[in-house]
Amino acid sequence: MKNTFKILSLLLSFALLAIACTEKIDDGGVTDGGDQMSFLISLPEAVSGAAGDIVSVKFYSGKGPKEGDSVVLKKGSSECECEIVAITANNFSFRISPQVSTGKYTFSIKRGAQIKTIGEVNFTIEKRVEIVEKEGYNVYGLISCDGVGVPGVVVSDGVEVTTTDKDGLYYLKSDEYNRLVFMSVPSGYETITDTCIPKFHKVLDGNSKTTERADWQLTKVDNKDHVMYLLGDMHLANRTNDASQFATFLADIKEQIKANKSKRQYALTLGDMTWDLYWYDNVYDLSVYVDMMKKKLTGLQIFHTIGNHDHDMKEVGDFNTVTLYKKVVAPTYSSFNIGDVHYVVLDDILCENTGTGGSGRKYKSTLTTDQLSWLKKDLSYVDKSKTLVITMHAQMYNEGGSASLSNASELASLCSGYKTHVMSAHTHVICNNDLSASNGIMHHNSGAICCTWWWTGYYVPELNICKDGSPAGYYVYQMNGTDVKWRFKPTGRDFNYAFRTYDRNKIVMTAANFAPNASSTGVTNFEKSASSWSASSKDNYVYINVFDYDKSWKIEVTENGKSLTPELVSIKDPLHLVTYEAKRYNAGSTPTSDFKARTVTSHIFRVKASSASSTLEISVTDRFGNVSTESMKRPREFSINEYKK
């Protein structure tokens, strides 16, 4: 077989269209009549594929086609009908008719004698190279670059793993349980991108008795040295002014994209891009998130990790909760290669919910045996000289360094021999565990873009902080070959904003001072939570919250030239107490238990000064030699306005 092929790219961009039931429904002016046809459809603006391909379309609020309906495509005087092959609660799929040619078509739904026009779709019809099917293999395809097949590309259905042959062809024996197939994008290439969403997986029909073809086209790039942005919890839900606050993050990361324009750049989320509680109430699910990101953040590919709030908790169990995610975002677990780094995305959220929402929203943090089995196969194709980056939503290890993931030891065993970085989020705190000496793993828990579900920024726009006191932000990883360097980037602040200081002598945290309108119950609860900071003090302690601290960092404090010794303490961050809990109690509300200030913050230090009015010189140096300093003039007031500066 020749190894030169021509295939066209697949582009899908969505525009939400609301169609009123009283409008004209086609150029002939036929009206709905007695059987009303009302649609709320997210229509593809462009579709590229071949005759017989299945195209999936999303609809909202149950306003989609019914059984027996069909799709009618009209271009000029030419008209054809496409079969609707499947309808679910919020999606329908149709098969591209052999009569469709490249061009713009009017897209309508036909029901009996009635037709409702939805909008227009641009079709690009591919002329695919014929591939000889192999008996016993039901999923197959071609991966090429500039018309030439790319050999050695890893392809999987989440269970079976194979590679392309010398002509870029692959064949899989798939039970199609996961209803998808994906490739592990090879080093030195990029896959087609739908604005900012890399297209490296295809949804299958789930019928292992039929054959299905999935092709990908790659572009050759130099990405050995690259930048990866790690993005923790976003919790976008159309509430608490989150869109406006998220715009601040978007502006910030766009500045970083400009600053790093000499390198290839990518982003990787760490889960909870959305908030399942508001998928239906606020009409903000994953498809809305994807549509927003495609409009608001371009110039880099964004890979994704699934979080617990990215599952549809109205479904029962685990498998059906991720149907929408797999359709519009990505597989729940997969891998890809950029330069000398092998990235693995895992799903460590196993849902056990009843499908009723509310108290039925149950899950545990673990990796399924299917994932671990797949990962073992995937890593068999990855040389030990490569750097391994694994992302998951919930932590592998907790702040004390003990296992948080139920099968952390099994995962660590699979990573043996690799220099491994594990990135997580979930808890909305920053925590680093360097376990490289024992098992080769550096574990990073990465804070949150939304901090405290956007509440602190809602109450005090200049102080959007997490429950450990760390500011809203994200990570910038510089990947140079196998070498990895990183810095935490506070949203709207300079990189050098690496710590925050508190003068204990000036803190008297009472409800009267910070929540004067709280109820009696609110007063009691707040003062119990803030008890470590409620009493006045003259002990001259200064507290330093070093946000991205790990044990390789150096903290130096001097008073009048004399060194003071920092000690790590277990205490709640005082600024989070007054920007979240106090504000909630003051408004007559109850703080969410998950976001009350933590009992243990793993990166607060204190020093004891000799005077209440001395100036302290503070220098913090990270593991890569980046230095942040502050000349702390005391006494320093403790107030919200003081820290808004």
Question: How does the language model describe each region?
Answer:
Residues 13-46, 122-134:
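Bacterial Sec-dependent N-terminal signal peptides
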Residues 66-69, 137-140, 145-159:
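Short, ordered, surface-exposed loop/turn motifs in non-cytosolic proteins
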Residues 87-94, 574-606:
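Aromatic sugar-binding surface patches on proteins
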Residues 131-138, 145-146, 189-281, 645:
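N-terminal active-site segment of His-dependent metallophosphoesterases
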Residues 156-174:
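Short, acidic Ser/Thr/Gly-rich low-complexity loop/linker segments typical of extracellular
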Residues 177-193:
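A short, solvent-exposed beta-strand micro-motif common in secreted/extracellular proteins
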Residues 191, 198-208, 279-376, 380-382, ...:
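Extended active-site neighborhood of metal-dependent phosphoesterases/phosphodiesterases
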Residues 441-548, 553-556, 602-608, 615-631:
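Binuclear metal-dependent phosphoesterase catalytic core
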